[in-house]
């Protein structure tokens, strides 16, 4: 990057997310914030984003955990983040990677891809949660970081908006599941559609409700080997299906 105004948007395949804020550990640190969206859904990829802000520029107002924002507000902030970030990258891990690695390792992969895809190399990466992927730079896990560290908040917004848009595209191809309404989460509507139609190729067959529907109806798509993820209520609400502030 030759200047802060150089295009710095990058979207890559794969998974692992990290975020870092502006409370630099040292004056010379380049801090990156990372977060993910889509651990709990029964369908679609897990998406991660990494964001670096320029500490010399005013901070964007209204940044917060994506779960407390309406869809309209997230879209507005998304545009501001990609316009004003010093660097950012959005990455994902596919359904196939989730099923082969498990959702935790796929999430770490998406985060790692997001950090490594940045056009500016950070010296410190702050990641929402209690785990960090293996990186070549310093990293720090921040529990509740999406509400505490502005660059993590920004990453949570980029990841959430990007994934929601992906699921809208999947809805166009597979309208019977209602991906436009629940973004792949295990709502009663989605579970009923799974029971009636069985899973499509975008469903995570390592997740118990999908596996059960597959075994009940059969879809011609092989089941993955390994452990089955039992979806809990916590997973169903892990990263913003239904904003805390109400439906957007």
UniProtKB/Swiss-Prot annotation:
One Gene Ontology cellular component annotation held by this UniProt entry: cytoplasm
User: Which EC class is the enzyme in?
Assistant: hydrolase
Cofactor(s) essential for the protein: Mn(2+); Mg(2+)
Q: Could you say which residues bind a divalent metal cation here?
A: 35-36, 128
How does the cofactor bind to this protein, according to its record? Answer: Manganese or magnesium. Binds 1 divalent metal ion per monomer in the absence of substrate. May bind a second metal ion after substrate binding.
Compartmental location: Cytoplasm
Catalysed conversion reaction: Endonucleolytic cleavage to 5'-phosphomonoester
Q: Which residues form the signal peptide?
A: none
Q: Name one GO biological process term.
A: mismatch repair
InterPro entries named among the record's database cross-references: RNase_HII, RNase_HII/HIII, RNase_HII/HIII_dom, RNaseH-like_sf, RNaseH_sf
Q: Which residues form the RNase H type-2 domain?
A: 29-219
| Pfam families assigned | RNase_HII (PF01351)
Q: Does the keyword Manganese apply?
A: yes
Q: Which domain of life is it from?
A: Bacteria
- Which Enzyme Commission number(s) are listed? 3.1.26.4
- Which keywords fit this entry according to its UniProt record? Cytoplasm, Endonuclease, Hydrolase, Manganese, Metal-binding, Nuclease
Q: Which GO terms describe its molecular function?
A: manganese ion binding; RNA binding; RNA-DNA hybrid ribonuclease activity
Biological role stated in the UniProt entry: Endonuclease that specifically degrades the RNA of RNA-DNA hybrids.
Family (UniProt) = Belongs to the RNase HII family.
How is this protein named in the record? Ribonuclease HII
What organism is the protein native to? Paraburkholderia xenovorans (strain LB400)
Gene behind this chain? rnhB
